[in-house]
Amino acid sequence: MNDKWYRHIIGARTIKTGLATFFTSLFCMLLNLTPIFAILTAIVTIEPTAKASLKKGYKRLPATVIGALFAVVFTYVFGDQSPLSYALSATFTILICTKLNLQVGTTVAVLTSVAMIPGIHEAYVFNFFSRLLTALIGLVTAGLVNFIILPPKYYHQLEEQLALSEKKMYRLFYERCNELLLGKFSSEKTSKELSKLNIIAQKVETLMSYQRDELHYHKNEDNWKLLNRLTNRAYNNRLFISHLSNIIYLPKHTSIAFDANEKIALINISNSINGIIQKGSFARQKKSIATLKSSVKQMDEFDQNQMKSTLIYEILLIYKILDSRYAK
């Protein structure tokens, strides 16, 4: 816990941005270069992972060169007092960066382009190469800071988001089963809750992608094992949500009649799943599962019970996912 105390006050990425700004400005001043352009580059170069910083840095450098080049060209043609110099520099920088697929560097390139115009005067070549050098300093400094200092660790966030996802999806399954038992086959409420659940699941995927990228640079066998465990957990959650969506998004005018035994089975299963978070374990409902399996066997998949058969299959698959997860 001692190495995480700063998270309660300031984020690691904020700290690294401050350090990158400090070192970038220091290096520029030592070389007697204007630091503002290097600082702009350094600030936007701090990404969630070192890999992202390096990958985007390869595109930000040429984009900055393009911006500086247009600033010099249009200042030479129209002068630094003409609005055309600013407008054309920005416009052509955006245009060329887009054409060359350098969109990640467009913002810095445009800012560099318009900001350097007032200071060019007659020193066109010097200003062009000095901006190129300062941009390189900003990129390299920020990349090294992001790589060396406080390497990102997303395990804690992943654990939190996975736990939140599981709590919500178990509760949503319980609520949806209650709706089905009450004959409410179309529900705006559960549809909205499912959308929120999918947003959390997407955030989990993003965090896992960040951590996977980071482990390519800071390799650790224990961390790889931990990430694999979290990945498997997230995969099972995705399967659960996929089957859950199939019992929420039903065709219009769906109408299903459950008999007394099927209703009791659904109540027992939904209560058991809803109680997982509170109890910390999964209480198997073998008798209820046997009831649903028996019901499916008696149905013809292609008669009027087709929708009911499909619905029960989805519930059985959800149960199987949890049965495997909590297997001893």
From Swiss-Prot:
Family note: Belongs to the UPF0421 family.
A Pfam family: ArAE_1
Organism: Staphylococcus epidermidis (strain ATCC 35984 / DSM 28319 / BCRC 17069 / CCUG 31568 / BM 3577 / RP62A)
TM ranges: 26-46, 61-81, 109-129, 132-152
Protein name per Swiss-Prot or TrEMBL: UPF0421 protein SERP1427
Cell compartments where the protein resides: Cell membrane
The keyword Transmembrane appears for this protein: yes
Membrane topology category: Multi-pass membrane protein
Keywords: Cell membrane, Membrane, Transmembrane, Transmembrane helix
Keyword flag Oxidoreductase: no
Coiled-coil regions listed in the entry: none
GO cellular component terms, semicolon-separated: plasma membrane
InterPro entries: ArAE_1
